[in-house]
From Swiss-Prot:
Locus of motif Histidine box-2: 133-137
Domain comment quoted from the record: The histidine box domains may contain the active site and/or be involved in metal ion binding.
Pfam families: DUF3474, FA_desaturase
Residues spanned by motif Histidine box-3: 300-304
Membrane topology: Multi-pass membrane protein
Organism: Vigna radiata var. radiata
Name assigned to this protein: Omega-3 fatty acid desaturase, endoplasmic reticulum
InterPro entries: FA_desaturase_dom, FAS_N, Fatty_acid_desaturase
Length: 380
């Protein structure tokens, strides 16, 4: 029997009965309509020209970086190029993500066209991921129905093979999980983002999934051709390493938007779950200089509740909503130029947030104290 840590305190560190006590799992005293009303009307307005200007900016930076790498092709430039280009790949992903939400423009055709280009270039199947991400937003904070970084139940956790358990809960493996998730989803779930007959998709969505998989295949074929033409080592340096940096950013950011807060946050089942309560379990993060580069994706609470708000209005919308959210909004810790401070929360969460109870409509992450002891013993 796994011995789990019992939740000792709530969202602000106070115990029940203390004057400062706050239970983050309690139903909020406001409705989602109250939050919506607090957000200025212009924050809902989408500007196609403004959105396209961000695409142009990012594509120009990606092109300039690649051209510089090809031109210099020297040992001192590559270590500078890799994190810069990988971060820009991540920025392209966020713009494609906005297309998937429809916050890029009011034209569904333009959203689909731009989204397919941006995501295919970084080997993401646009429609396959867009649909599963929609499921994530519609069911955020739900133990069984959520899609992204879903907590494992104790039963599923105990049934993991040793290798899967080690990879999931040992740094740095979790921040390289995204390509595997695209192919096979998370433990306890079945399906692939590339398979139109996966249970991720309805029959009416299959054609779009086929289109995205074909686009993904075309880009992969071009990359393989270039590898044969200019050499696999050069392509690894030009595209492969930045792709891995992009994957690290994606997993790092998405994980910490739903995990790793200073105090444990609830997950829900059954009648305790609601769209509002699930959305309030998300966490805003400050990424310093990277905030502007990756289009303010750190303003995650309001984005999760209202994904149709364009990214360039999220900061203002968040400020306006704070008066309604009260203690249900957790102010992010300020970052230096680069968000190195977040590594601490990532490592703490990976080492402590292992599973949730098989039963109960409001549950919190629990820790398996034997996990790393067993891994160490078996490795000796």
């Amino acid at each position: 029997m796994i011995q789990a840590q019992t939740l000792q305190h709530f969202g602000n560190g106070a115990r029940e009965g203390d004057q400062s006590y706050f239970d983050p799992g309690a139903p909020p005293p406001f409705k989602i309509a109250d939050i919506r009303a607090a957000i200025p009307k212009h924050c809902w307005e989408k500007s196609t020209l403004r959105s396209l200007s961000y695409v142009l900016r990012d594509v120009l930076v990606v092109t300039a970086l690649a051209a510089s790498a090809i031109s210099f092709n020297s040992w001192f430039f590559w270590p500078l190029y890799w994190p810069a280009q990988g971060t820009m790949f991540w920025a392209l992903f966020v713009l494609g993500h906005d297309c998937g939400h429809g916050s890029f423009s009011n034209s569904s055709k333009l959203n689909s066209f731009v989204g397919h280009i941006l995501h295919s270039l970084i080997l993401v199947p646009y429609n396959g991921w867009r649909i599963s991400h929609r499921t994530h937003h519609q069911n955020h904070g739900h133990v069984e129905k959520d899609e992204s970084w879903v907590p494992l139940t104790e039963k599923v956790y105990k049934n993991l093979d040793d290798m899967t358990r080690m990879l999931r809960y040992s740094f740095p493996f979790p921040i390289f999980a995204y390509p595997f998730y695209l192919w096979n989803r998370s433990p306890g779930k079945e399906g692939s983002h590339f398979n139109p007959y996966s249970n991720l998709f309805s029959p009416g969505e299959r054609k779009g999934v086929v289109t995205s998989t074909l686009c993904w295949g075309i880009v992969l074929s071009v990359l393989l051709y270039l590898s044969l033409t200019i050499g696999p080592i050069f392509m690894l340096k030009l595209y492969g390493v930045p792709y891995l940096i992009f994957v690290m950013w994606l997993d790092f950011v998405t994980y910490l938007h739903h995990h790793g807060y200073t105090h444990k946050l609830p997950w829900y089942r059954g009648q305790e779950w609601s769209y509002l309560r699930g959305g309030l379990t998300t966490v805003d993060r400050d990424y310093g200089w990277i905030n502007n580069v990756h289009h303010d994706i750190g303003t995650h609470v309001i984005h999760h509740l209202f994904p149709q708000i364009p990214h360039y209005h999220l900061v203002e919308a968040t400020k306006s909503a704070k008066s309604v959210l009260g203690k249900y909004y957790r102010e992010p810790q300020k970052s230096g130029p680069l968000p190195f401070h977040l590594l601490k929360y990532l490592l703490q969460s990976i080492s402590q947030d292992h599973f949730v109870s098989d039963t109960g409509d409001i549950v919190y992450y629990q820790t398996d104290p034997k996990l790393h002891q067993d891994s160490w013993t078996k490795s000796k």
